[in-house]
Amino acid sequence: MLTFIKTEFLKLKHSKIFLLTVLGALSIPSLLYIGLLTGEHATFQGILDYCATYACSLFYIIIFTIIIAYLFGREYTEHTLKTILTTPLSKTKLLIGKYLMFFIWAFIITTITFTGTVIAAYLGGISDITLSVGLNSYKEMLISEILLCLSFSPFVVLSLVMPNMVFSMVAGAIFSIINLFVYTSKYAPYIPWCSQYLISSNEIANYSCNTATSLAILLVTFAIGLTISYIYFTKKDVCL
C-alpha cells in the first residue's frame, strides 16, 4: 500500500491538479490578508475562525470534489485501469489506496491553508499570535477535515459513475452554494457537509441537535457511500 501511495504522488508530478488545489488552499489566507490590509480589525483567534469556517464549509467542498474526480476517475479517462489491474493489485486494495490518498491529500491542503493563514496574520500586523491558540485551531481544522473527508464518499460514487472533471466541479459548486444557505439554518447539524465544522468547533451546542446525532448521520453517509462505491467498482467490467 505504501508503494501505491508513493506511485500516486509520483503521478502528481506530471499533473497540474495538485498545484491547482494548493492555489485553492492559499486563496483563503490571501483573501484574509487583503482584508487585514484594508484596515479590517481582527484578532488571531478571529482570523483563524474565519479561515476554518470558509475553508470547511465552502472552499474545501470544491477542492475536495476536484481531488476525488482526479483520483477516482483518472484511470477511467486515461484508459489505464486495465493495465494497473494486471499488477498484483486487486480492485479492493486499489479503492482503499485511493481513499487513503484522498485523506493524505486533504491533510496537506488543510495544513497549507492553516500555515498560510498564520503567515497572513503575522504579515497583516496581528499582535496576539500565540502557540496555544494556533494549535487549538489547527486541531479543530484537522478534525473538521477528517469528518468532511468521510462525508465525501458519495462523491466517490459520482466520480466512478461519471468520471468527468467538469461534472465534479459543477457538483462541488452546487454543494458549496447549498452549504451557504443551510449553514446558518436550524438544519445545518443534519447536513454532513455542514455539521463537520459545527462538531469540530463545538458550535453544535447552539443547536437543538446533539453531537451524537450529527456524527451518526455523517458516519452513515460515509458507510453508504463507501459500500456503494465498493460494490460498483468491484463489479463493474473494466473496458480498454
Kindly give the residue locations of the regions a language model identified.
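Aromatic- and glycine-rich beta-strand/loop motifs that create alpha-glucan
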Residues: 1-22, 238
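Terminal transmembrane helical anchor/hairpin motif
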Residues: 31-50, 169-240
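Hydrophobic/aromatic residues in alpha-helical transmembrane segments
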Residues: 64-68, 81, 116, 154-155, ...
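Secretory targeting signals
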Residues: 28-64, 96-162, 200-216
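Membrane-helix interface segments
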Residues: 16-18, 90-96, 133, 164-169
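Pore- or pathway-lining transmembrane helices of multi-pass membrane proteins that form conduits
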Residues: 20-25, 162-180
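Transmembrane helix-loop junction
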Residues: 74, 87, 118, 122, ...
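Helix-loop-helix units of permease transmembrane domains in multi-pass membrane transporters
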Residues: 71-103
